[in-house]
Amino acid sequence: MKKVLLIFALLFSLDRLTKYLVVKFLPLGSEIRLIGEFVKITHVRNPHSLWSISLGRNFPYIILGVVAIVFLIALILDSIKSKNILNANLFAVILAGVAGNIADRVHFREVIDFIDIGLSPTLRWPVFNVADSCISIGLAIYFIMVLKEYFAKRSQ
């Protein structure tokens, strides 16, 4: 349980710290090029969901986030109970991301995004943040594990 809490605390804190630094030192709409056009820090605000996908102007993002947090905590506790520590750790990574973006929505009514990756000014991935990365990476690894287990059972 301590490792799960540590993973959550470190990633949540990293998300909050990076967003704080962006808000404090980089005016909205400004950018800092780290590796030419490929990697930039760009301060944008996102009223939508992951990767700027819109679910509608009045979509209850905070309510959905709270439901996700409760669900993830239940998954973590169940994983710990069944001694599936890898799943518990993955759910803690996802939880840190959800909690980080919900904290933004509560405080700013939108999410602070700043990681800007692309090949040119017109060929870019949607700007994202540490929380988005936690959600995406955690879910990707979890789904790969589920698929691997499914195909292993199917081949027997």
Regions flagged by a language model, labelled:
Residues 1-156:
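Alpha-helical transmembrane bundles and membrane-interface segments of multipass inner-membrane proteins
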